[in-house]
Structure formats: structure tokens, C-alpha cells
Amino acid sequence: MKTFFCNRTVDKGEMKRLIKWVLLNYGTEKTTRLIDKLKTMGFHYATHAGISLGIDDLSIPPIKSAFLLNAENDIYENDLRLKRGQITSVQRLEKALDIWNTTNDTLKTEVVKYFRSTDIFNPVYMMAFSGARGNISQVRQLVGMRGLMADPQGQILDFPIRRNFREGLTVTEYMISCYGARKGLVDTALRTASSGYLTRRLVDVAQSVIIQQVDCQTTQGLRIVPELEKIESQLIGRVLFEDVVDLETGRMVGYKNQDISPALALKLIKQPALTIRSPLTCRFHAVCQLCYGWNLAQQKLVQLGEAVGVLAAQSIGEPGTQLTMRTFHTGGVFAGEATEKVYSPHNGIVFYSKQARGRKIVSKYGEVAFLTFEPLKVKIKNDNTTSVLEFPSFTLLYIPPGQTVGEHQSLAELSRIENKQNFQQFEVGTENVQKEFMSNCSGQIFLPQRQNALINEDNAGTTTFNYSEMWLLAGKILDSKTLVPGDQIKNALYPIRSKINCEPSRLTTTLPLGYVFPIDSNQTSLSKLQSTDAETLKQLPLLQFSKLSADNLKFARSYALELNKTLFHCDSLSKYRFITSDLEHLPFKSKNLFFNQDTPTKKVPTFKIKFSRFGKADKFNAKEKFLLLRSVTKLVSTQTNPLKTQFANNLFVQNSINKNKKTFLEVVKPLKTFQKKTNFFPSPTHENIKSFNPSLQNGNLMSVDADYVRLNVQYGKGFSSLLNCGEVRATNCMMTEKDQIAFKSPVCDLKMKVGDYARVEDQLTTSTRIPLSGQINFITAENVLFRSVQPYLLVPGSNVVVKHGSLVQENSVLGTLMTSQSTAGDIVQGLPKVDELLEAREPQHKVLTSMHAKLSTLFSQYGKIYGLREGCELSFQKIRQFLVQEVQDVYQSQGVYIGDKHVEIIVRQMTTHVVVVDAGKTGLLPGDIVDIRRIEQLEHTGFFAGVKYRPMLLGITRAALMAESFISAASFQETKRVLSKAALEGQIDWLTGLKENVILGRLIPAGTGLY
């Protein structure tokens, strides 16, 4: 062997290349000896060097503290913009995650630089970068910062772990990192099992694919566009389908049936398109030598008898353990790589041309930035240093000219847009998501009147806004129920100007034994009610009625109730209070209590009650937003006309407002109580439900004699029974001392007047900034009195469920924000994705097109143009290429590279079956699944003439069970079914695959056994 001198660092990649080169040039024996010598030398020097980790080897780059300080400043600026109402809470969270993710990535780069510049023989550096043990991500956690963690639900927390393992974690950081650590261990265990099962299915589906002949004489090839990045998986080791001529020189570059070496591949890369041979286009039942190409391990044509199916299955299954198991849910930055940011090299003032071509845009985080349309030079100048930075086109500049920047401050973001045409499609790959936003204090809503701000208002009282804002004026919500004229008010030290807003509370009372359920529009109605036990009687607190307008109230405090009899009736309007009584009743299935004792005004909780045993529930749209489930009660009116009362609809519409403004010491008179009741079903009950009571049959008026209905009797289908609104209280909003800020300021210099709204950090005077957002309430000679205010930004498409002037408590839902998040965020990644593709499952998200639907569409198009057989073949070819590309994308995104031919062999096994539509005069039946190659063979004999079929995509499990060998299929899954079917049909197993021969103890038809 010649002596070669090679002066370079031999890491894992270099070692691979060296061994591969020796193997190809000098054969197996000499390579084995070389590897043995390398091993001995490696161990010898490892013991001399002492490559074991000590605590001193974990050196932290000094620049870390500067990076963290900058990140903290960015976070502070981000939070300030939220307080000023310039961004939404969703944008604040996404920006915070982006800041920490970018800081972490930049710090990782700095760690590598620091090691390289200070100590390249550092054990940590040598281990990680030689590929011997560990990786860059683990090094980052040892000496950089641990970074962002996920909570148990998989959501990324915006509280990062700033420390590393060298510094040690705080208790809080340790608890946060526990989620991820345990998840990682569970993931690894699950991944091993899933990967093993995937390999088993792949081997079972492809075990019969063996190289049996040299050439299949195919008339079809696979058309590809060569790409330099994919040269290894795409070209090297393939066979050319036709001669290739250089378009510029006219010289022959490659010949038909020539295998492509690495040298030839570099020449072919210049061709606009190539046609190569592929297992997808092979005419044989297995695969021929030329369609398969090289055995990639030996870099020469595959030998006859090679079990390439098993090889392909192992090549795809083995890297399965390296794939991620989790479903990413990150909303952008974590699903892909972090955007590349540019930082200021030192502090100074930024200078660049104001005439630069570009436009101002708002980034997805709500920041105003300048997008350049051409390359731009930016100067950063201070007393000592001047730096010039050159930015390419389509860079986002966050700093305007003339502004001062600090060292390591974020200046710009390099965009992935390459030209102006792509600018329009900048937001491709995002979807709109609605997220709720809450009030952070109690108070009154103020919606500024803006032209074109309001887009529409629907029946439910939901208002949709364009870009606009909303202000929440802080104040304490007081209930005026206890105030009567003459009462003294403790600590009534409130400004005279403060307004008191009154609105009817959302108190609702029900008819006797009624239960109120707040519901959303179009939610499934609770239309059926069941008594759980027809015999057992239990106790329940009942409603005590007090007289309002009638004398003849018929009500006994305590007596037993007979089944199916009226409990009581009254002919007056009533208000109620809970009492505990000895009355007995039939218990309901739901065990929930709907009201707290003696607190009838408390907001009624919403309960989910499932009556799924009783069939399909109905949808209904209730304007009143309340569904009343109640025992049927008799109401007797002495008047000749039915009970008619004026009914104020807005009392029952969710979020309804009564905008009466009164001073605080006036007592608000309670509104009258109203009652309305319709005594018929608006729609007939289901036909198949019969009642023991003839008055409850389909379409009849509702009887009021039955108190409870028996099992399987429908209680009512969307009945309109409106609520008895008892004593309605007024609610007042008043400003307390903690809701106002007073500070001294020279009034002559004021830039604002009484009633103006100001945001935090706004300029009040030339020397004073406002510490909190607020509304100017009062100005004296020395002081300015502010009312605390929280501004909210309403982005386009936001829904607001509160009205102007309405009162809200702390942590109330104000509406939903429309926000866009990356669609890559929620796509299943890694092993589950490979599994979904190879099993040809229907996608869970309806946005994604089903492969089965795609195949059907392609066949209907091609079938009309090219006929049955050609159309079937062409639609199969398209779907095969799509599947190969999708599987490869998943593996390549995780840094795993597999030869295309391995995936093609598996995909080919999935796409070789058709479903018989019209059997003609053959012995087949419509719906039979047949191998298309069998039909093609029999069509030549004329036996299969007239048969009609359509292509079918089978997942690998079904394809393995549909195998020609019933012995192979029975040993895989569903043994009884497969053997019973084979016995009934009298199938013959020709023992062509490996598995069936192994089971029977025969010589396998591979290797020398082929002959």
C-alpha cells in the first residue's frame, strides 16, 4: 500500500470518508487491518490525553452575560409595548419566545467560537465535534443556557432557563426542566417499540422483492430534475434510461443502461432533466438488476439473488429511532430554524440613507420595521469606532437612522425572501387562529369612535373590528342591592366627577324546579332528560315562593310527591329563595347542583351533560342564550285571556347593557319582573319515541300535568320556555383610590387636557413621562390626577363581546384575537408522519388532501384521455413520486439520508393493486382487489377482456395481508381470517418469497438459492 500524507482533523465524517476510500480501492481485507490499527491508536492517545470531563473543562464564554442583558432589555421593551396597547398579548408571547430562541442560538455559536479560540483540546469540544459522544445541543446546555422548555401540555413556556448545568439550576428551573426530561425518557422507550414495529411491517411487505434477472426491457423511465443537494440519493448508483447529450457541446455524456458514478453524476447535474431507470417503472414482479442499480454498500451493480426488499425495509426502519416522536406545537420559530439576526458590534449612532428603496411594514410580532428592496450599507459610529455593515436586499431593519444602539443590540433580520416576486407570498404557510383575551382589572369599557373601525355586528352581539383599540378604565364594581335612601357610605372619598354606570345584572330566575344552562349559539341542545331510578326517592332542596302579586298561593312546605303528579302550581309571578325541605322527587341523572344556597345572583356555571344513550341531539340557535330544563309546572291564570306580559328581550341577551348614568347616592329602582311561557313544541318530537302520556305524543301541545317523564320519553325538543327574571339589581362602577395616580407636574407645560387618554411612557411635559397608562381626570395648579387605564390592541378580525360603556370584572373574557401561526407548527412530525404516509391513512386535518382522493382524481383525468390501463399506470406513477418525496422530506428534515431506491421499492408494493368495478365475463366479483400485473398478464390471453377496474392505494399492513403467498400473510397478522379465506378459495402458494420458504424449512430463493 502506498503512503499518503493527509493533513486534516479526523473527525467522524472524515473517518467515514477515509474508510470508504480504502474499501473501494484496496478491498475488505486491507480495510479491516487499517480499522484495527486506527482503533489501537485511538485508545492509546485517548488514555494519554485524559479525555474525561472535569468541572474545570466546562468553561462558560464571558459574553453570555451581555447576551442575557440584551435579551432582558428586549423583553422589557416588548412588555412595554403591550402595556401601551401597541401589540396584542399573543404577539407579546410569540415575540418573547423568538427573543429567547434567537439568544440561545447566538449563544450556541459563541460557545463554539470561544472553544475554538481558547482551547481546541478541551475534552468537551473534542468529544462533541469529533462525533464521538454528545452533540452541540448538549454542549449548549452544559456551558451556554438551557433555553425554552415545554409545559406538560406541550406549550412552550415564555420563562426560559437562563442558567446552564455548570452554574446549576434554581428550584424553579429544575421543576420546569423535569417535564422535558421525563418526556424524553418516555419518548425514547416508545420510539424503540414503534420503530421496531415499523421495520417488521416493512420487511413483511417487501420480503419477496429479490433481484431475479438482469433486464426487464422496460419502455418507461423516471423523469427527474437533478439537484446538487440530493445528488447522493437521486443520482449516484442509478442507471440511465437513455443516452444523454450535452446541449452546449453536442457530445455524449452518458449512455443508455450506464450506471452513474460520482464523477458522471457531477457532469449530469448540469442537465435540465434526466430519465433514469427505477424500481417504480420495472416490469418484473420483483425488480431487475438494471432498474435497481448499484448495491450502495459495494458501489457496484447489485448481484442477482440479492434480497433488496429486506434491505430497503431495514434502511427505512433502522433510522426510525432517530426520528422525533412528538407532534410539534410551536407556532413558527421552533418548527423551523431561527431567523438569522444581525447584532450591533459596539454602541453608537446608526446612519443610513433615508432615500433607500423599501417600505415600512409591521412584522408578525407587531414591530414596525423597514424592509429594504436593495442592498444597503449601515454605519454605526461613536467617538472611537466606526463600523460599516452591508445588508442584502429584503432585510428587515428595526432601528431608524439617527437612533442610538447599544453593544450586541438586535439591528436587523435577514429575510429568506430572494426576490421581489416572492414578497407577495411572504406569509405563505400560516393559518389564522382565534385566542381569547381577558381583562386584567375590573372597570368600564371605552371603545373610541373610529371611522371604518367597525366591520360588522352579528345577532349574538359580537362586534368584529379592523385595526383599532379598546380601553379599560379601572374601577371597582359595586352592587347597589344593599343601598337604600338615607344610608351612610363608609369612606365615600370619591371625586365628584366620577361617573356611575348602571346596568341590569345578569340575574335570571327560573320557573319552579328549573335549572338554567347558559349555552353558546348552535351548541348541541340538551333535549332529553332521564330519570335514573324509577323507584328510589331522594331529597332535594326546593324553591320557596314568596307572593308578589297574588293572594291564593298554593304551596305546602313539606309533603311527599307521588310519581307523575303535579308538584304544585301557583298563579302569581314569583321571586325565589332556596330552602331545604323534605319533599321527595325522582333524581336526575346529572349530579350537579346548579345554584348555591342563598346566593341566587351568583353566575350560573355551565355544565356539560351528555345524554348520548337517547340518540342524536338537535342543534338550535337561541337568541336568549339560555336553555331551561325544568319540571313541567301548571300555571293557572284567572283572566280569560292567556297570560300576556310585556317581555324585555335585552334582559336575556348575553352581555346586554342598559346605559343609564346616575350619581352614586341615587338608588337605582329595580326593574319589574316579567314572565312569558309558550306551551307548545315548536317542532315535533322524534317519531320513534312513544310516551306513556298521550298528551306528550308527537306535535301535541305540552301537557302541564306530568311532573317527570319516564325513561325513553323525549322531554322537549328545543322548546321555547323563557325565564322568569326576578328582582333585577343595578350594578355600579366606581373609581377607588388605588385606580388613580396623582403626581406633581407644572401645569403650564402640559401637552394634554382633561379627558385625554395617555399611554405609559408618553411625554406628559417636556421633563415628565407617564408611569402608567391612564385618562386625565383632574388638573390642579400642582397636580395631575390620572385614572388607571389598560389599552388593548384589536387586530383585524378580532371579536369583541363587550359593548362601549359596559362594566367588566377582573379576568372576564373581553373577546378573541385573530392571530396567524405557522401551519408547520401543528403538523405531525417524525415517526408518526412516516407511519401515516406508509399506511396511507386519511389525514386528520381536512385541509390536507387525502392521497386516496388524489389518486381517484388523477385516474378520472388520465382515464378519459389515455384509456383504462394507461390511465391507471399514469395515476399510479404520480402518486408514487408524491409518496417517495413526502417520506424523504420527513427523514431529511431530521438529518437522516436514505437512498431513494429503498423508499421506491416500498412505495411500489403499496401501489400495485386495483379494485374490480365491472368483472365482465371473468370469474371475479366487483370489489375484488387484484394485483395489476396479474390482470396485465391475463389480458394478453383474452381471458380478462372487458374487465373494468380502478387503481387502489394500500397501506403497508394491508399490502402485506394481500400478498400472493397466504403462508406469508398468515404469519404476519389475522392468521385465522387469512387461512380460512385461502382454504375457501383453494389458493395455491407458489413459495416465491423468503418468508414462506423459511416457515417451511426450505432453501430461500435468494443468493445462491436463486439457482
Curated annotation (Swiss-Prot):
Its cofactor is Zn(2+). It comes from the Eukaryota. The keyword Transferase applies. Zn(2+) binds at C216, C282, C288, C291. It catalyses: RNA(n) + a ribonucleoside 5'-triphosphate = RNA(n+1) + diphosphate. Gene3D superfamilies: 1.10.132.30, 1.10.150.390, 1.10.1790.20, RNA polymerase Rpb1, domain 3. Binds 1 Zn(2+) ion per subunit. It is an enzyme of class 2 (transferase). One of its GO terms (molecular function) is zinc ion binding. InterPro entries: DNA-dir_RpoC2_beta_pp (IPR012756), DNA-dir_RpoC_beta_prime (IPR045867), RNA_pol_Rpb1_3 (IPR007066), RNA_pol_Rpb1_3_sf (IPR042102), RNA_pol_Rpb1_4 (IPR007083), RNA_pol_Rpb1_5 (IPR007081), Rpb1_funnel_sf (IPR038120). Keywords: Chloroplast, DNA-directed RNA polymerase, Metal-binding, Nucleotidyltransferase, Plastid, Transcription, Transferase, Zinc. GO terms for biological process: DNA-templated transcription. GO terms for cellular component: chloroplast; DNA-directed RNA polymerase complex; mitochondrion. It is found in: Plastid, Chloroplast. The keyword Transcription applies. It holds the Pfam family RNA_pol_Rpb1_3. Its EC number is 2.7.7.6. Its main location: plastid. DNA-dependent RNA polymerase catalyzes the transcription of DNA into RNA using the four ribonucleoside triphosphates as substrates. Belongs to the RNA polymerase beta' chain family. RpoC2 subfamily. In plastids the minimal PEP RNA polymerase catalytic core is composed of four subunits: alpha, beta, beta', and beta''. When a (nuclear-encoded) sigma factor is associated with the core the holoenzyme is formed, which can initiate transcription. This is DNA-directed RNA polymerase subunit beta''.
